[in-house]
Amino acid sequence: MIDIISQLGGVAWTIVAFVVALSIIVGVHEYGHYIVGRWSGIRAEVFSLGFGPRLWSRRDRRGTLWQVAAIPLGGYVRFLGDADAASAGPGRPVDPALRRQTLEGAPLWGRFATVAAGPLANFILSTVIFAAVIAIQGVAVDRVQVGKVAPTPPGIVNELRAGDEILSIDGRPVPDWPALFSAGRDLPAAAAFDWTVRRDGAEVTVRGPHPAPPLIAGVAPRSAASGAGLRPGDVIRAIDGTPVFRFDELRQRVEAADGGAILLRVWRPGEGEADYTLVPKRQDLPTADGYEKRWLIGVTGDSGYFTPATRAPGPFEALRTGIAQTSSIIVGSVSGLWAMLSGQIGSCNLGGAISIAESTGQAATTGFTSFVLWIGVLSAAIGFLNILPVPVLDGGHLAFFTWEAVTGRPPSPRALRILTSIGLAAVLSLMIFGLSNDILCR
C-alpha cells in the first residue's frame, strides 16, 4: 500500500511539474505572438493559457481578454478575425474598416514577424534561463581550485579541502581543467593517489580519490538507472561484487555484460549502501563521427568529489554562454532529426508526451535549478519544432509568407486547405507515433 501511495505521489508530482513547465513555455511562446502582433497593429481578442472552460479572466484597456482555462495543456492567442497566430487562410468576417487590424489584413512583414515571434520567444527564454543560471552559479576559475568538497563513502580517503589549488595528481601536472579531466581518463583504477596542492600559500601532498570516481552526476529519464531508483550523488562501490574506483570501469562492465543484468552496490549520502540490479538498454549514442549503439544504464559521471571554485561572470559572458547553449540544443535537434530520417538511429529515440512529462518530473525532483534548466532545454526544442516548414506549425506559415513574398500572391485557398490538412495529419501522426514509442520502447 505504501508503494502504491508513493507511486501515485510520484505521478502527481510529474503531472504538476509538466503542467508548470508547459504553461511557462507556451505562455512565453504565445506572448511572443501577441506582443509583436500588437506592435504590428494587429488586435488580439483573446490570450489564453489552457483550453476549455474559463477559470479566470480580465479584459485590458486594449480590449484583449486575458484568461486561464481549465485544460492546462497549451494556450493560444486569437487575433481579430482569426483563430490564432499560427492559423492560415481566411478567418472570421470582420468590418472592412477593421481589416488592417486582423492577421490576414496586416502587411506581409507584420504577419511574418508576428508568427516568427513565437519560436523566437522560446529561444530568448532558453537563452535567458541559461545565462541567468550561469550568472548565479558562476563559472569555474581558470586555476584548478576546490570549491566545495562532496561527501565520500566510508573507506575512501579524501584529504582535499575547500580552497586547495591542485598542482599535480600522482606526479602528473594539473595546470588546468583539461589536464584534470585527462588525468581522470588515464590514471589506473585505485582507491587513492597523492595529490599535490597549494594550501595557505604552501605546497603540501595529501591523499585523495581517483579524479574520475564512479560518482553519479545525472540519471537519464526512462533509463535502467532511473527505473532502479539511482540518483545524482550516488557512488557505485562495486559491480557484481568487484570493487570499482573509476567511472570508466562502469562503462566497461556494462558493455561486457552485453545486455545481461548487473548488480551494483551503491552508497548514498545519509543512507548508506544498498544493492541495485539493472538491465542495460541498447541505445544510440552520439559520437564525433555520428552515432553508435551501446549498452547503457543511463548515468553520467561527475568530475570528482568536489565542485570547482567559481567566479561571477560578466553579463556579456553569461549571455554568450546562454546563446551558445541554446544554439547547441538547436544544432543537436537538427542532427538528431536528420539521423532519424536517414536511418542512422532508431525511431525509438523519438519520445512523446509521456517521456517529456517523465523527464520534467525527474528534473523537478532533482532540484529547482535542474527544473529551470530543463525548461530552457524544452523551450529551445519546442521553438525548433515550431519553425519546421510544416503547415499548421509556425514554420509552415512562414513558408507560405515566403511564397507570397517571392510570387507576389498568397497560396490559393484550395492549396492552403490541402496543405493544412496534410500538415495536421502529419503532426497528429507524429504525436501518436511518439506516444506509442513511450509505451512500446520502454
Language-model segments: which ranges?
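Small-residue-rich helix-interface/hinge motifs
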Residues: 9-94, 385-407
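Alpha-helical transmembrane segments of integral membrane proteins
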Residues: 17-21, 373-377, 424-430
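Internal alpha-helical transmembrane segments
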Residues: 27-28, 39, 75, 79-87, ...
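PDZ/PDZ-like peptide-tail recognition elements
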Residues: 112-150, 178-221, 226, 275-309
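A short glycine-leucine-enriched loop at secondary-structure breakpoints
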Residues: 153-165, 184-188, 224-235, 252-258, ...
